[in-house]
Amino acid sequence: MSDVSGGESSSHKRNVDSAANENDDMQNKRQKTEELGGHDDQLNDIFNDPLPGFGGSESNSTPYNDNAQEGELGPENFDATLPKEGDPLDIDFDNLPTNFLEAEQATNANNGSQVDTPSGPGSVPNMSVTTNSASMSASPNNTPRPTPLSKTNSRSETPVGNSSRATYDGTNLKQEFGINGLSNKQEALNRYSQMPPTNRMNHLAPQPQGIQGLNTSSIDRIPSTSTSNKEQLHTNDPSKLNDALAAAGVDIQHEEELLMQQHLNRSSRFPSAQQPPRQRFAQTSLFSPYHVAAFMQRVARENGVMQNFYQDAELLELMSTSCENWLSNIITKTIILSRHRRRGIPTITNTKQNKKTASSSASMSNPASRSELSKELRNLAAKQKEMEERRVSKRMALGLEKDGTDPGNGDPANGKAGAEETLHRAANATAAMMTMNPGRKKYSWMTANAGSGGGDDSKVASEKDGKSKQSSIIAARGDNGLRFREIRSGNSVTMKDLLGALEDERMGTEKAVLKGYAKLKD
């Protein structure tokens, strides 16, 4: 009996102690709530369901009965205190209980939006506030309610691609709205009752989504203890947003400058169609810059100079211009030597006879079409012809040679020879006429040789000569008169002219002159 009575007394003592502890807890809670200026029933309105910390466990907790005494619970107004689904939350931050904040500090909150099941009296569910309404913690009647996280991290940074946002710490909430008081209550209520501004700079980034009656935009303004101010991710300042191009190392301003420079270079390289052709020709160099640079680099390497000439455009242009001037000088000298070769140096005299002969020769022939050399050769041939006629005349006077046109000549052998010669000339004239131009008009002098003999030949020769009458003896020998003769290469520049111009150069022409004389045929 003593054991039974002892057990009953111990159990009764434990019940009394637990009841005393519960009464002490209730008195402490009411005292702290009165310090904040609120009542216990306002805490039920905040979270839309009864809290196990005020009524024991969550299953048997009931709201306060207004008709009963303070601290007693009644089931009359249990359903009336629960808000309907969809009603906005009315949070009074001035009258928050401190026991809720102290209990949360001792609880290890999970990262995310899950609700911890209360394990006993006085336990507080752990929830996290996020911007996505689908990931918020909910009460048994599917009504969202915010729950602060742990004390350690007052703000957690998330990447741009993640849909979750930074969470708010209950410690900061206590410091801002707790015992120390609030300097500007209306400003805090406005911050937590408006939607956060959207990110207009990056449309791909997830836009913040607030819950009913709660705004988390000011959470980003709270400085983080783990990161410095320079490394913070500013989501509300468009000028400080981390752009994807800047994160990749792309400088937009530098790229624009390069693009503008390329456009200017392209416009200077390819002039417009409205530009005059002379200016465009002046800008074009004689040689290709690539070939000039390759040649200069090869010669410089042979002399021990290592330099890249491809990048120096001004040097290449200067070298091309100098080569053009040097070639122009060589070609000018070559043309001068060609003229001197074809035309002799005229004699400069002040005599009237020379002036008359010069004027008469200029009127008879075009000096531009016939060279002085051809004229001198023709004069020499005319003098030789006159000498030959005088010699033949002397032989005929001495009887050493007979005239072929004499009609009294009755030698049959001579007559037969004359007939054969006449037929031969006629055949040659016919063949020449057929081969050269068979369809042209026939003149009398073309067929006069076949019937008349050497007398007509002298007439034709005299017409061609124009100066002196040709002898019949010379005409019988087949001489049709003198003509002007021009050299085939007389009006062009030859290898001799070019070699003469290169020999005048002092440096850099030795090898070229040797190769030229080796290729010279005549």
UniProtKB/Swiss-Prot annotation:
Subcellular compartments: Nucleus
Ranges of Low complexity composition bias in the record: 358-371
Biological process annotations from GO: transcription initiation at RNA polymerase II promoter
GO cellular component terms listed in the entry, alphabetical order: transcription factor TFIID complex
Keyword Cell membrane: no
UniProt xrefs under Pfam families: TAF4 (PF05236)
Domain Histone-fold: 293-379
Compositional bias (Basic and acidic residues): 26-42, 456-468
Domain of life: Eukaryota
Keywords annotated in UniProt: Coiled coil, Nucleus, Transcription, Transcription regulation
UniProt-annotated stretches for the region Disordered: 1-172, 194-237, 346-375, 398-420, 448-479
A Gene Ontology molecular function term of the record: DNA binding
Biased composition regions of type Polar residues, renumbered to the chain: 57-68, 105-117, 125-172, 209-237
Residue ranges that the Swiss-Prot or TrEMBL entry lists as coiled coil: 8-37, 368-395
Major localization class: nucleus
InterPro entries referenced in this protein's UniProt entry, alphabetically: TAF4, TAF4_C
Role according to the record: Functions as a component of the DNA-binding general transcription factor complex TFIID. Binding of TFIID to a promoter (with or without TATA element) is the initial step in pre-initiation complex (PIC) formation. TFIID plays a key role in the regulation of gene expression by RNA polymerase II through different activities such as transcription activator interaction, core promoter recognition and selectivity, TFIIA and TFIIB interaction, chromatin modification (histone acetylation by TAF1), facilitation of DNA opening and initiation of transcription.
Family to which this protein belongs: Belongs to the TAF4 family.
Quaternary context: The 1.2 MDa TFIID complex is composed of TATA binding protein (TBP) and the 14 TBP-associated factors.
Record protein name field: Transcription initiation factor TFIID subunit 4
Organism phylogeny: Eukaryota, Fungi, Dikarya, Ascomycota, Saccharomycotina
Name of the encoding gene: TAF4
